[in-house]
Amino acid sequence: MYKRQVIGNGVVIDPAHLVSEIVLLRGQGAEITPQTLVVSDTAALILPLHQAVDAAREALRGAGKIGTTGRGIGPAYEDKVARRAIRLGDLASESTLDAKLQALTAHHNVWLKASGEPEADPAVLKDGLMALRDDVLPFAGQSWRVLEEARANSRRVLFEGAQGVMLDIDHGTYPFVTSSNTVAGQAATGAGTGPTNIGFVLGITKAYTCLLYTSPSPRD
């Protein structure tokens, strides 16, 4: 059976967690190689900076906190939309990485300083990324091309999304939602394929709504 895993461009990725999961799976006997796993080179990265911003914002919200996971997902998506994100492919060029980290930290440090939080050091962030570079860059590739090749060869492709509809940034219980689209339509844009290439959608209905950790339920 032809098996290849693809992490699409619509995902924000914590490279440290990615490496640790690869090590874990290999330890359990799974074959994880650049031939079996492709990670979109345009996927935005989650940095320790994003986790610090996430935690600080939640603390400032007090009783009105959203209930985020604290993993930096929201701030990472913000940077992606604002066109200042560090993307996986950026790790291939130190000069590109340096310039983008300077711009990224300059933006966030204004808020961190005003909030009384420690400022982010671009050199420290770079050191962390460079330590992971050789472990993650071999998996970087064009996810859309992998999917197009699979389609052209009549292979079956299973798209898997995370979280429920009610956590969708547009269609969920806003503002107590995640920072991306979680509905079936996101599979096309988040993976890099045309919407007409998705032939079947399977939805799971539950008797309760998916919520963030401390989010109020609709009845509240």
Residue ranges, per PLM feature:
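Conserved small/polar residues in nucleotide/adenosyl-binding loops
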Residues: M1-Q5, Y213-D220
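Glycine-rich phosphate/pyrophosphate-binding loop regions near the starts of catalytic domains
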Residues: K3-A16, A55-R57, F176
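Structural motif
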Residues: R4-V6, Q35-V38, P75, R155-L158, ...
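Short, glycine-/Ser/Thr-/acidic-enriched flexible segments
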Residues: V11-I13, V23, A44-L45, A162-V165, ...
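Predominant activation on well-ordered alpha-helical scaffold segments within soluble catalytic domains
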Residues: P15-R26, Q102, W144, E148, ...
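Internal alpha/beta core interface subdomains
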Residues: L18, I22-V146, V157
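Conserved phosphate/anionic-ligand binding catalytic regions in large, soluble enzymes, centered on
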Residues: G67-A82, R156-A191
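A conserved active-site cap/scaffold subdomain adjacent to cofactor or substrate pockets
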Residues: T173, V177-S215
